[in-house]
């Protein structure tokens, strides 16, 4: 008799995705972050659901309702901080996951890669709208500044911004719709993640060498289930250390001041995980140019499969590309630092140099390195 997990219509799907899935025998810990992202998403949906039970999306009571959650709701403080810091863990995993894809040439799976880019945009939109909900100073001014960027679009810009706001400024209508979108988008993300996995399982996972591993596959369970559990435990440990010892480490003190449209904070900045893009936006003096650079800083990922010039898929055996990859990582860290600094010398110049370097590395230097490495192979 066939095992029920192989015959039952529902269990069969789970079996083919998480139990009997043929996986390469040599994938490293960099491959753990997909499952960690799944755990982060589940955790964010669960904590978010409980927060939504007590939150009110009204400008008069939103700030107080968050304070009420932290003070009066049973374990409300831990739910709130798990949700806020869970977003940070989500983005750490997300950026490592994308970085792994870049390093090992996983972008060769075009459908998986492109859905991943759509997922990245959706998660960023969700996180941005979530940051607006506590209705502190940085929530309000962040929402005002970022939505205002759309006014740079010629002809329809101003109309578009007022349409998103639901009025002539960020107000009650904006907060209500942001809450509605912030609630629904994680479920859209979950559906997209399902499609992401569906396309990945059509081809099978890549591996560090970038060479086909069809002749050497092992079952996902127990080998990678146990490996993923270790990753999950480390993720939860890190998150709990953050939540229980310094929950406000990654937040902005300005967000503990209720939103006031008449008082602008000295430095308006988004959460740390958007600072690199914010730095690129600010480094261009023209508004429309800045907005285009901001969008392209993420959308450039879609060009990466077209810019692949090397005969090898992975960077494992390509030292020049490796140097450029880690330069890119250092450059992104520099941009993240600059995004949190005031707009004054020398930060302006550092930001502009780092922005130019970011686009140069991806569009020019890395493809050229691939061609050089192809020639080195002939020697």
From Swiss-Prot:
A GO molecular-function annotation: ubiquinol-cytochrome-c reductase activity
Q: Which domain of life is it from?
A: Eukaryota
Does the record's keyword annotation contain Metal-binding? yes
InterPro entries for the chain: Cyt_b/b6_C, Cyt_b/b6_C_sf, Cyt_b/b6_N, Cytb/b6-like_sf, Cytochrome_b, Cytochrome_b_C_euk/bac, Cytochrome_b_N_euk/bac, Di-haem_cyt_TM
The regions listed as transmembrane in this protein's record are: 33-53, 77-98, 113-133, 178-198, 226-246, 288-308, 320-340, 347-367
PANTHER family given for it? Answer: CYTOCHROME B
Q: What is this protein's record name?
A: Cytochrome b
């Amino acid at each position: 008799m066939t095992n029920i997990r192989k015959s039952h219509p529902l269990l069969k799907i789970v079996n083919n995705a998480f139990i009997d899935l043929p996986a390469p025998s040599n994938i490293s810990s960099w491959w753990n972050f997909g499952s960690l992202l799944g755990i982060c998403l589940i955790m964010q949906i669960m904590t978010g659901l409980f927060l939504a039970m007590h939150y009110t999306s009204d400008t008069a009571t939103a700030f107080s309702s968050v304070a009420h959650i932290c003070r009066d709701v049973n374990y409300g403080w831990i739910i709130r901080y798990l949700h806020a810091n869970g977003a940070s863990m989500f983005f750490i995993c997300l950026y490592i996951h994308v970085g792994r894809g870049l390093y090992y040439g996983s972008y060769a799976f075009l459908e998986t890669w492109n859905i991943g880019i759509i997922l990245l945009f959706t998660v960023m939109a969700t996180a941005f709208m979530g940051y607006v909900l506590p209705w502190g100073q940085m929530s309000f001014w962040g929402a005002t500044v970022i939505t205002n960027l759309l006014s740079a679009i010629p002809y329809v810009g101003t109309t578009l911004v007022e349409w998103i706001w639901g009025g002539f400024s960020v107000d009650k209508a904006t907060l209500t719709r942001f809450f509605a979108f912030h609630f629904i988008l994680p479920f859209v993300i979950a559906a997209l993640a399902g499609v992401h996995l569906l396309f990945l399982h059509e081809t099978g996972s890549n591996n560090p060498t970038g060479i086909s591993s069809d002749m050497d596959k092992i079952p996902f369970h127990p080998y990678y289930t146990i490996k993923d559990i270790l990753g999950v435990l480390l993720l939860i440990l890190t998150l709990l250390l953050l939540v229980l010892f310094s929950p406000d480490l990654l937040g902005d003190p300005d967000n503990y001041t209720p939103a006031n449209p008449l008082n602008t904070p000295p430095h308006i900045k988004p959460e740390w995980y958007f600072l690199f893009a914010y730095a690129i936006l600010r480094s261009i003096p023209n508004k429309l140019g800045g907005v285009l650079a901001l969008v392209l800083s993420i959308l450039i990922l879609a060009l990466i499969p077209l810019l692949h010039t090397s005969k090898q898929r992975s960077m494992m055996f390509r030292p020049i590309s490796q140097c450029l990859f880690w330069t890119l990582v250092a450059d992104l860290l520099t941009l993240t630092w600059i995004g949190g600094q005031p707009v004054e010398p020398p930060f302006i110049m550092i930001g502009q140099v780092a922005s130019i370097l970011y686009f140069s590395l991806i569009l020019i230097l890395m493809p050229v390195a691939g061609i050089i490495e192809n020639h080195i192979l002939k020697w």
